[in-house]
UniProtKB/Swiss-Prot annotation:
Signal peptide: 1-14
Annotated family: Belongs to the protein disulfide isomerase family.
Site for Lowers pKa of C-terminal Cys of first active site, residues: 111
NCBIfam families: ER_PDI_fam (TIGR01130), pdi_dom (TIGR01126)
Organism, scientific name: Schistosoma mansoni (Blood fluke)
PROSITE patterns registered for this protein in UniProt: THIOREDOXIN_1 (PS00194), THIOREDOXIN_2 (PS51352)
Descriptive protein name: Probable protein disulfide-isomerase ER-60
Amino acid sequence: MRWLLSCLFLVAFASCSKVLELTKDNFHSELKSIPVALVKFYAPWCGHCKKLAPEFTSAAQIISGKTNDVKLVKVDCTTQESICSEFGVSGYPTLKIFRNGDLDGEYNGPRNANGIANYMISRAGPVSKEVSTVSDVENVLSDDKPTVFAFVKSSSDPLIKTFMALAKSMVDDAVFCHSHNNLFVTPSDNELRVYLPKRLRTKFEDDFAVYKGELESNNIKDWIRKHGQGLVGYRSPSNTFYFENSDLVVLYNNQSIDSYPSGVKYLRNRVLKTLKDNPQKFKNLVFAYSFADDFSYEISDYGIEADKLPAVVIQSKDKKYKLEKFSLDAFSDFLNKFEDGLLTPHVKSEPLPTDDSSAVKKLVALNFDEIVNNEEKDVMVVFHAGWCGHCKNLMPKYEEAASKVKNEPNLVLAAMDATANDVPSPYQVRGFPTIYFVPKGKKSSPVSYEGGRDTNDIIKYLAREATEELIGYDRSGNPKKSEL
C-alpha cells in the first residue's frame, strides 16, 4: 500500500510540474511555439542547480496560473551537450530568455519562486503599454520604478521605433508607456516624459521631467538615468543603473521604504531641503537613500556601526568619504567641505603589521604606497583572499620564491588581502589571486602577471623582468655560481 501511494504521489507530482524538459530533438520546435521562455541549462550533479530546482518548479506553477504566454524550460547539459554548446553554456545553472525560439538575452533576475515568476510575467506583454485615456495614465505609473511616457501624434512617428528599442533594452529599469492621443498637452511636436516612482513623490520637486534633447537612444537613456529617481533616489540592489557614472552621495539607514515609508520620506525630505537651498552648488552630485541591510557589504567596507546610522558616504571615483550620525547641519557642512576639497578620504585597511621579518611583505592599505611605490624597488604584488583555494595553493610557492630572493637589494615580494583592504588605483582585482609586477620608474603602469604559479616560474619571471639583473640569478633564472 505504501509503495502504491508513493507511486501515485510521484505520478501526481510529475503531471503537476509545469517545467518543460526539452532535448536536442524538440528544443527548437517547441520553443518556437512559446512567446516567452526561460530556459535553465543545468547538470544533475550541480549543487547550485539542486538549490534552484524547487524555486524554478514553484515559479512555473505560479506562472501557469497567470499566463499561458510564459513557460519555464530545463535542459540537462550532461545528456544534451549539443544544445548547451550551441548557446555557449559554460557553467551551471545558466538561465537564458527566448522569444518564439530566438535568444533574447541572459536572465539576470531573482532566483526565488515569486521573483522568477514576476520577472518573467513582466516580459510576457509588450515592452510598452499603450494608454488611451487620461484616467489610465495615473493607473499605469509605477510605484517603485520610473515610468517613461511617449506622447506621439501617430503610431508611425519615428520616435516610436527609437522608444520601443529603448524600452526593450531597459525593461528591468523602468516602465514604458505610450499614447497616440494628446492626453495632457497638445504639443506641436512629440513629448517624452519620465515620471518619478509614485512612492518618491514630494512637494520639493515635480512629478515628471520633459526631455528636450535629440531623439537618440543613448542620450535618452542618460536623461532617464539622471531624472528617473528624482533629486534623491531610493537605491536598491536592483536599480543601481540610476546611480552609476557620477559622484554618489548615499544616506544609509536601518529603515527600508517597504517597511518604514514615512521614516524614509522624512530623511529624504531633509536631504531634499538641503539641495533645494543650494541648487547649483551640488548639481554634479547624485543623491540616494539606501536601506543598510541591502548594502551590508558597503557598510562593512566603510566601517560603519549600526549605532552610527543614519550615515552618509560620498563615493567619488576611487575614494570614499563618510559622515556618521547624520544631522542636517552636519550634512550641509560635509557637502561643502567635499566641494571645497577639505575632506579626508576613508580608507579600509587592516592594522599596520608589527612583524616585518617575513620574506613576503604584508601589504595593507595604509602601507601600500610606501612599499609598492618605492622608486628604488621592483615589487611583485599578490592580491589574495583568505577563502580562495587557488590562493592557498599559490602562497607557499610564492613564499618560497620570496625566501630565495630575499637578499636582492632592489626587489620586494608582497601580498595584500584584497577583501580586508581597499585596493588602490590603477590596480584591478576581478578574481583571486591577482598578481602584478611593478617595476621602479613605472609605478603608474603595473604589469599584470600571467605566468606560471610554481616557485621556479616566479623566479624566472623576476630574473627576466627585473630592472637591474638580480645578484643571485641570471636573466634566464639560473642560480649564479658563488665565487670562491
